[in-house]
Amino acid sequence: MALNLGKSVVDFLTAHPEEKFSARQIAEWLVATFPAECSAKKASSQTLETDADLLQQLVAEIGSQRPRLQKKHANLKTTEGRPRKYYVSEKSDIAEVAAAENVGVVAPVGKDEAKLGEHGLYPLLSSYLWAEFGVYSKRIDEKRSSNKRGPNGNRWLYPDLVGMEDLGADWHQEVKDCVNQYSDKRTKLWSFEVKLLINRSNVRECFFQSVSNSSWSNFGYLVAAEIEGQDTLKELRMLFAAHGIGLIKLDVENPSESQVLIPARERGEIDWDTANRLATENKDFLEYVKLVKQFYQTGEARPADWDVPKTED
């Protein structure tokens, strides 16, 4: 009997509701569950010479059948990013966001699993930014704000993380000194809004929150541990074209494998009026400004002053 791949995939995911699987994981299950059908598929093909070839073919077919399967099964959903994950959920988009915010996202710890809330994502993002871009990051805690303007006066004002990129980290000392004398820029300032889950129900709210609290910087990013649905990513690309806020998919299992799905559009100048508002209202942001000033004064950034992951000597 020939392998009914589409039905088998849906049956497998339905038997494991809310659990997310990559196409490769599903393909491995197919090979283990339907050995005779998979062997027949391999034998009937002139191109599938090895088991690895068969597995890769199943992965490709799962991906190619995804649009058709999602049209037929409304509860079949996918995440965006690498690798794409497949899952079945009866929850609405709004309910999925609420569940993520209440429970968190799954991150493996050894063989066990732990649930990460939004605050648990910050050190993972800091680690990625440092390893990938050499960006010194700093957490901005909105609880350290004055709130002089009332309960909603500072709504969407503060980013979750801010960062400083040392443009001359690899420059010769003479070049650094020359730039200082020339009074040219030595840094790019970054700003980040972090979310556990972005889907169709909250994509515009999340994006415009990022526009509101990160447009002061050279590079503003919306960061998400999970992005559900191709329509969500399409919407974000459309919004980027108008506003320039980028998108980072944060890999909670392996932060170094996180991806910039949409590069932010650089702003040539800092919006110092907004930066002043942030520094006036929030002690963490004021400390960030002081650290940037200190860097320009000394030419050095001390990792101990920033949320930079410690390295072993």
Task: State the predicted function of each range.
Residues 125, 161-173, 183-199:
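Conserved catalytic cores of phosphodiester-cleaving nucleases, focusing on short active-site segments
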Residues 104-172:
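Acidic-basic catalytic patches of nuclease active cores, encompassing PD-(D/E)XK
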Residues 179-182, 237-313:
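Non-catalytic C-terminal interaction segments of nucleic acid-processing enzymes
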Residues 22-23, 95-133, 298-313:
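Charged, often low-complexity linker/regulatory segments
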Residues 1-15, 33-117:
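Phospho-regulated, low-complexity intrinsically disordered regions of nuclear gene-regulatory
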Residues 25-27:
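A short acidic, leucine-rich amphipathic alpha-helix
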Residues 198-203, 216-254:
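Nucleic-acid nuclease catalytic cores
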Residues 19:
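Flexible coil/turn residues that form the inter-helical turn or adjacent wing/linker of helix-turn-helix
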